[in-house]
């Protein structure tokens, strides 16, 4: 019967009874574990103390001096004076992409696969 991978169902009510021999097998009924002895008040207090510590750290950063106007770069110059040729950068990027495409088109010979 086990050779054809089919389940057999029995109509015998004694074999299918919930209190049959299967009671000793498998998982038993869930046992309630005793609860931890930690009240909600203790948990809230620990969270509040952590929040107070974080607020203290933020207060240290509030005393920053204003930014001096001499430190602000005028004209939107964000490359520290370096001139960027965007056309050349685009060509370089295209060349790199072409190299990646070459790898995708590679088809191994049958001799390479026999190693």
UniProtKB/Swiss-Prot annotation:
Residues 11-21 have a biased composition (Low complexity). InterPro entries: Histone_chaperone_domain_CHZ. It comes from the Eukaryota. Residues 1-115 are annotated as: Disordered. Keywords: Chaperone, Nucleus. Residues 22-32, 82-95 have a biased composition (Basic and acidic residues). GO terms for cellular component: nucleus. Pfam families: CHZ. The keyword ATP-binding does not apply. It is found in: Nucleus. Residues 39-62, 96-115 have a biased composition (Acidic residues). Residues 1-10 have a biased composition (Polar residues). Belongs to the CHZ1 family. Forms a heterotrimer with H2A.Z-H2B, stabilizing the association of the histone dimer. Also, with a lower affinity, forms a heterotrimer with H2A-H2B. Forms a chaperone-bound H2A.Z-H2B complex that acts as a source for SWR1 complex-dependent H2A to H2A.Z histone replacement in chromatin. This is Histone H2A.Z-specific chaperone chz1.
């Amino acid at each position: 019967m086990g050779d054809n991978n089919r389940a057999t169902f029995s109509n015998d009510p004694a074999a299918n009874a919930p209190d049959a021999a299967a009671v000793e097998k498998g998982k038993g009924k869930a046992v309630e574990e005793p609860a931890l002895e930690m009240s909600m008040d203790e948990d809230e207090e620990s969270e509040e103390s952590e929040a107070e510590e974080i607020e203290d750290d933020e207060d240290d950063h509030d005393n920053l001096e204003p930014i001096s106007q001499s430190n602000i770069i005028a004209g939107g110059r964000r490359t520290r004076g370096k001139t960027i040729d965007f056309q050349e950068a685009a060509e370089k990027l295209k060349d790199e992409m072409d190299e990646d495409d070459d790898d995708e088109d590679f088809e191994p010979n049958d001799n390479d696969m026999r190693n």
